[in-house]
C-alpha cells in the first residue's frame, strides 16, 4: 500500500513537474513569441520605411529620367524643327528656282515658236525666191545661148573658169592682207619688246676708242710731220699701218686705226719724233722700230702683271706674251685682257664654292682667250687656236680642254670646262661690258686685211680710212709692176664676193724698190 502511495506520489510529483515545466515553457514561449513579434514588427516597420525610401528614390529617378528624356526629346524636336525649317527653306528656294526656270523655258518656248514661225515664213519666201530665181536663170540661160551660140555645158565651163579665177584672185588678196596684218602685228610686238628691253636695261655704255691723240708743242709741228709733199706722213702711215689725221684741232694729231698695237706703236714713234725734232723717212723708220720694241716690252710686262694679279705662276714665257697682247685686243668693245682677268677671278670664286682646284680654275680662266692674241693669218676659231697654243707650251690636258670647249668647239666633259663657259658668259653678259658696233667695224677691217694678205707676194696689208681703203705692200722680187695691177683687180673681186659694205673700197697696191749703198 505504501509502495503504491509512493509510486502515486512520484507520479503526482512527475505530473506536477511536467505541468509546471509545461507552464514555464509556455510562459517562456509566450515571452519569446512576444519578443519575436516585437522584432518582427520592428523589422516590418524598418522594411516599410526602407520600401518607402526606395519607392521615393525610384519615383525621383523616374522623374529625373522622364525630365532628361523630355529635355532630350525637346532638344531633338528643336533640331528637327530647325532641320525641317531649313529643308522647307531649301524646298521653297528650289521651288522658286524651278518656277523661274519654268518661266524661262516657257519664254524660250514662246520665243522658239515665234522664231519657228518667222523661219517658216522666211523659208516660204526663200522657196518662192528660188522658184523665181530658177525661172530667171532658165530665161537668162536660154537668152545667153541664143546670143552667144553656146550650149549649157560650154557656158557652165566658162563660168566655172571665171569663178575659179576670181576665187584665186580673192584668195591671193586675202593671203596678202593676212600677211600684211601679221607683219604689222609682228613689227608692233617687236617694237614693244625692244622698248621694254631698253626701258629695263640700265647698264653702263663704255666704248673702246679706235683713235689716239698725240699732243704737239705748237701747230708748226704739223707741217714738219706732213713733210715735203706729204712724204713724212706717208712714211709714218706705211710703216705703222695707221691713219694720221691732221686737221684744225689745235696742237694735236689724231692717230686712227682699229689695231691697238699698231696704234700704240705709232703713238710712241710720233711722240719720240716730236721730242727729237728730226722728222724724215729714215728717222721715222728708226722711231717705229724702237717703238715696236717698247710695245713688245710693254706687252710682256702686261702679261706678267696679269699673272701676278690673278696669282697664277709657272706659265710659259710665250703664253705670257700672248696674255700681254690681249691688252691691245677688244671683243665687242670689251678689253680682252681685263675680260680674261675677270673670268679668272670668277672661275676661282665658283671653284672655291664647288670645292675644286682654285688655282687650276684661275689658270684656265686667264688663258681661255689667248687665241684672240694671234693675228688673223692663223685660221680657226680663237678657242681652238688657244687650245693648240696651250698644248704646244705644256699646259695640262684639263686646261687645254677647257680652252677648246668654252665656245662649244668641243663638248664640255669636265667641271672646269663648264666653269670657264659660265664665267665667260657672266663677264661678257654684264650690262655695259660689251658693245656690238665697234666689234663689227673692227671685224670688217680685219676681213679686209685677211683678204689682202691671202695673195702670194703680199708682205703687209693695212686697212685705213675706216675701211674705205686698203694698202697692200708687195715684194718687188715676187710681184712686177704689171702684176700689181692684176693683183689689185683680184683683191677687189674677192672683196666684192666675200663682203658686204657701203660705198666703195680703194685697193692701193704699193711696190717699193730700195737701192742702198754705203760711201766709205
Swiss-Prot record:
Transmembrane feature ranges: 3-23
SMART domains in alphabetical order: HDc, KH
One GO CC term on file: plasma membrane
Any one GO MF annotation of this record: RNA endonuclease activity
Main location: membrane
Keywords, comma-separated and alphabetical: Cell membrane, Endonuclease, Hydrolase, Membrane, Nuclease, RNA-binding, Transmembrane, Transmembrane helix
Keyword Transmembrane helix: yes
Membrane topology recorded in Swiss-Prot or TrEMBL: Single-pass membrane protein
E.C. number: 3.1.-.-
Domain HD positions: 336-429
Top-level lineage group: Bacteria
EC class (word): hydrolase
Positions of the KH domain: 210-273
Annotated localization: Cell membrane
BP terms from Gene Ontology: mRNA catabolic process
PANTHER family per record: RIBONUCLEASE Y
Function field: Endoribonuclease that initiates mRNA decay.
NCBIfam families the record matches: HDIG, RNase_Y
Protein name: Ribonuclease Y
Amino acid at each position: 500500500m505504501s509502495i503504491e502511495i509512493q509510486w502515486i506520489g512520484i507520479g503526482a510529483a512527475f505530473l506536477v513537474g511536467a505541468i509546471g515545466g509545461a507552464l514555464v515553457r509556455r510562459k517562456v514561449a509566450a515571452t519569446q513569441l512576444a519578443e519575436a513579434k516585437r522584432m518582427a514588427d520592428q523589422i516590418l516597420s524598418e522594411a516599410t520605411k526602407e520600401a518607402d525610401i526606395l519607392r521615393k528614390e525610384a519615383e525621383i529617378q523616374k522623374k529625373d529620367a522622364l525630365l532628361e528624356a523630355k529635355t532630350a526629346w525637346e532638344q531633338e524636336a528643336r533640331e528637327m524643327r530647325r532641320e525641317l525649317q531649313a529643308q522647307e527653306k531649301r524646298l521653297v528656294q528650289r521651288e522658286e528656282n524651278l518656277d523661274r526656270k519654268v518661266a524661262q523655258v516657257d519664254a524660250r518656248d514662246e520665243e522658239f515658236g515665234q522664231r519657228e514661225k518667222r523661219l517658216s515664213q522666211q523659208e516660204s519666201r526663200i522657196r518662192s525666191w528660188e522658184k523665181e530665181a530658177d525661172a530667171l536663170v532658165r530665161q537668162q540661160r536660154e537668152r545667153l545661148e541664143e546670143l552667144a551660140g553656146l550650149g549649157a555645158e560650154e557656158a557652165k565651163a566658162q563660168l566655172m573658169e571665171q569663178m575659179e579665177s576670181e576665187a584665186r584672185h580673192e584668195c591671193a588678196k586675202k593671203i596678202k592682207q593676212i600677211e600684211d596684218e601679221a607683219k604689222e602685228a609682228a613689227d608692233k610686238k617687236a617694237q614693244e619688246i625692244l622698248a621694254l628691253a631698253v626701258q629695263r636695261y640700265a647698264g653702263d655704255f663704255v666704248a673702246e676708242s679706235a683713235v689716239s691723240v698725240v699732243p704737239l708743242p705748237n701747230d708748226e709741228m704739223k707741217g714738219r710731220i706732213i713733210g715735203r709733199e706729204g712724204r713724212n706722213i706717208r712714211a709714218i702711215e706705211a710703216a705703222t699701218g695707221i691713219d694720221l689725221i691732221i686737221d684744225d684741232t689745235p696742237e694735236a694729231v689724231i692717230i686712227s686705226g682699229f689695231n691697238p698695237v699698231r696704234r700704240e706703236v705709232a703713238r710712241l714713234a710720233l711722240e719720240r719724233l716730236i721730242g727729237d725734232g728730226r722728222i724724215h723717212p729714215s728717222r721715222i723708220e728708226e722711231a717705229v722700230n724702237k717703238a715696236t720694241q717698247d710695245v713688245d716690252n710693254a706687252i710682256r710686262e702686261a702679261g706678267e702683271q696679269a699673272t701676278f694679279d690673278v696669282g697664277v705662276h709657272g706659265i710659259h714665257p710665250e703664253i705670257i706674251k700672248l696674255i700681254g697682247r690681249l691688252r691691245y685686243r677688244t671683243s665687242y668693245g670689251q678689253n680682252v685682257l681685263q675680260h680674261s682677268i675677270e673670268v679668272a677671278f670668277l672661275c676661282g670664286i665658283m671653284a672655291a664654292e664647288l670645292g675644286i682646284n682654285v688655282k687650276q680654275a684661275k689658270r684656265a680662266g686667264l688663258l681661255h682667250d689667248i687665241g684672240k692674241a694671234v693675228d688673223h693669218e692663223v685660221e680657226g676659231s680663237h678657242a681652238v687656236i688657244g687650245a693648240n697654243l696651250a698644248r704646244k707650251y705644256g699646259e695640262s690636258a684639263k686646261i687645254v680642254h677647257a680652252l677648246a670647249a668654252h665656245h662649244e668647239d668641243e663638248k664640255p666633259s669636265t667641271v672646269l670646262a663648264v666653269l670657264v663657259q659660265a664665267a665667260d658668259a657672266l663677264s661678257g653678259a654684264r650690262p655695259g661690258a660689251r658693245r656690238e658696233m665697234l666689234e663689227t667695224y673692227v671685224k670688217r677691217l680685219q676681213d679686209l686685211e685677211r683678204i689682202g694678205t691671202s695673195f702670194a707676194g703680199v708682205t703687209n696689208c693695212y686697212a685705213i680710212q675706216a675701211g674705205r681703203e686698203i694698202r697692200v705692200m708687195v715684194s718687188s722680187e715676187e710681184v712686177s709692176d704689171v702684176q700689181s695691177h692684176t693683183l689689185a683687180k683680184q683683191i677687189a673681186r674677192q672683196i666684192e664676193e666675200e663682203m658686204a659694205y657701203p660705198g666703195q673700197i680703194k685697193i692701193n697696191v704699193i711696190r717699193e724698190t730700195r737701192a742702198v749703198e754705203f760711201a766709205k
